Amino acid sequence: MYTFEVFDSRTRSIVKLEDCLLRLYVCGITPYKSTHLGHAFTYVGFDTLFRLALDSGRDVLYIQNISDIDEPLFQYAEKVGIHYKDLARTQTKRFFEDMHTLECLPPGYVIPVSKVLDGIKTGIEGLISRNMAYKLPNGDVYFDSTLTDPGKMFCFDRKTAMSLMLETDTGKNPFDPLLWRGRGAEPQWEASFGAGRPAWHISCAVLSNLQTQYENVLHIYGGGRDLAFPHHEFTNVLSKLIRAPKDNKQQDTVQDVFMHTGLVSYMGDKMSKSKGNLVFISQLREQCEKIGLHHSVIRLALLQRHYREDWEWQDECLDRAASRFRLWKSALQEYIGAKGIRSTADQNKGTQGAWERIHGGVFDSNFDHRQPIHPKHSPQMRDYSEHGSAGQNGTDLDLSLYQAIRFHLCNDLDTPKALDAVDSYARKGTITIPEARAVEKLLGIPLTRV
């Protein structure tokens, strides 16, 4: 096992990941519209972390949620005249297809909010009983934010924190986040404190708080930088309070780290549904297919930016990635030709088969939030070991490219420098098959499958 370093957005410092269970919770989608580049940049970034952590020999508990109980989903379903459950299933399938396009590995657990409703109710009941949450006459339940210092976790002053609050409904205090929408809520579920449905922060708090039997746990909260406050702060506060002893003392052995990806702009503004300046992954895939490019070029275009960087998408981003991909592929073909090898193409479907396998069970399978969960990885990760798949039965040159990629990724996922390292080897004339497999395992670019 080897150590690596990441940047903690809360402490604004580098954290070294030692020997521990790595629990990675990345906020998933609200399944009502397709995946755009802003989403993709986040998921590719944390997929790279997932790959590196597995390669290092760690146990990794990677969880993503699906917000199938969420106001934007209900509103959009009503607007287009479709049942929200049908919309959630259809859009989740499309999201999985987009994740395959991006060559992302499926997390160990992809869990809809609807599967942990009982846990959410129990969590809210506990907060109410400890006078940490309160119910209004209209049925809404809010968390009492006076128990914390909103914005402090990420060094926002009160004025800035207030400007970032997304709550359209307020309780006794403008910083109090909604936990349970009681008034006029349809659909709704019964609870001891009144019928309604859960809100965003408490849902993620419960999902990120699923029990494990490990003692030494480092918990990474992942998402876009715009989630830091209020979402990640309140998710973390609620999570700690839910798992704290009933005497209200927050005795906790879990170390929390926050990693946030940069924001992607297009046409001068941050990509957002409200502004309509979105570039969808499905559109880029069609664009690649029309000109004979493999879809992994989209992932390569995203890896050209450091995960913490704010940047703007332009057509040149894809062109540059395509040139890079051709350079790498040509260098591999040079090696294949020199060795007289007929084909290196793997006969598997890569990440596609893995995403297809989990799709059917996401909404239909039973999930007991009370039972401890354990690390589990997709089938294509079976050959991960401390040395990865690169360098095994290869030459010193094979191993040194693997080491070069790993060196840069261990430095806070420095993908731009990792790509430069592959460029350097490709320009020397050849990329060997073991080197190409190192590129796939660590960077997710499948040179041997295209």
Swiss-Prot record:
It catalyses: tRNA(Cys) + L-cysteine + ATP = L-cysteinyl-tRNA(Cys) + AMP + diphosphate. Keywords: Aminoacyl-tRNA synthetase, ATP-binding, Cytoplasm, Ligase, Nucleotide-binding, Protein biosynthesis. It is found in: Cytoplasm. A motif ('HIGH' region) lies at residues 29-39. One of its GO terms (molecular function) is ATP binding. Its EC number is 6.1.1.16. InterPro entries: Cys-tRNA/MSH_ligase, Rossmann-like_a/b/a_fold, tRNA-synt_1_cat_dom. Monomer. Belongs to the class-I aminoacyl-tRNA synthetase family. This is Putative cysteine--tRNA ligase 2. The gene is cysS2.
